[in-house]
Regions:
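Hydrophobic alpha-helical transmembrane segments of multi-pass integral membrane proteins
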Residues: 17, 60-78, 101-102, 106, ...
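Membrane-water interface at transmembrane helix exits
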Residues: 25, 34, 38, 76-80, ...
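Alpha-helical transmembrane segments
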Residues: 7-23, 90-103, 160-165
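Long, highly hydrophobic alpha-helical transmembrane signal-anchor segments
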Residues: 1-14, 66-88
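Terminal transmembrane helical module of multi-pass membrane proteins
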Residues: 143-218
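Membrane-interface helix-boundary motifs at transmembrane edges
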Residues: 48-57, 82-89, 120-128, 155-157, ...
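Alpha-helical transmembrane segments with an aromatic anchor "belt"
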Residues: 84-151
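N-terminal juxtamembrane cytosolic/stromal segments of multi-pass membrane proteins
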Residues: 1-59
Length: 218
């Protein structure tokens, strides 16, 4: 089994780097960070910071780096469950990190472009801010999950699958909150919404999975 020979060094580096990013965020943006921790529990964070729409702020950028970092670590962990032979190396790590970052930033750019084309810049900016906040929250959750899976449960199959359910639940809950906040806009453009889900949410994930699963570089 691949999980039996996986070195934990990369997870130690990921955990320490991620903790440093979170610590820097909390130190520089204490009030913002504390409000952000209640993102799923209530709507205070969105109400307070939604009008600013600063999805390219330093605060979000640091949390975005943390998200990409922990996503790569989680992909390594999940690959052990699927027995996919992902090579653990700096090169592979950087490729995966770049793919995830490029995918997410690319989606943001496309959404901004669509907002400009259809003259819904403000609504699209709000949608992007909500989605980025939701994803960055997932990044925070993945930090303890990854550490527990590696250092406590030692890549246990049940623990990995349970963690996947938890992560998916958080993502779905964040999507529901986003849909509720933009329900009028969605209902008024329902066909475009379905097209958006298929092309910008589901489609790229399938392509990314096939690319990673079939790549000779990973």
């Amino acid at each position: 089994m691949i999980r039996e020979v996986i070195s934990s060094d990369i997870y130690v580096v990921c955990s320490i780097t991620s903790l440093l990013l979170v610590l820097i965020t909390k130190t520089l943006y204490k009030r913002n960070f504390l409000d952000f921790l209640s993102f799923l529990g209530n709507s205070n964070y969105l109400k307070i910071y939604l009008n600013q729409n600063k999805f390219f702020s330093v605060f979000n950028l640091i949390l975005f780096l943390n998200l990409c970092l922990n996503c790569v670590a989680f992909m390594y962990i999940y690959s052990s469950e699927l027995e996919i032979n992902l090579i653990i190396s700096i090169k592979t790590f950087l490729i995966l990190f770049g793919l995830i970052g490029f995918y997410l930033i690319g989606k943001i750019c496309i959404k901004l472009f669509l907002g400009y084309i259809f003259n819904i810049d403000k609504q699209m900016s709000i949608l992007i801010f909500q989605q980025i906040s939701s994803l960055n929250f997932v990044g925070l959750i993945l930090l303890p999950i990854n550490s527990i899976l590696v250092f406590t449960f030692k890549f246990d199959s049940v623990a990995i699958n349970t963690s996947i359910v938890v992560v998916i639940s958080v993502v779905v809950f964040g999507m529901i909150k986003t849909i509720q906040s933009n329900l009028k806009l969605i209902l008024a453009n329902f066909l475009y919404f379905i097209l958006y889900i298929c092309t910008l949410e589901i489609g790229p994930l399938v392509v990314l999975y096939d690319l990673i699963n079939g790549s000779n570089y990973l």
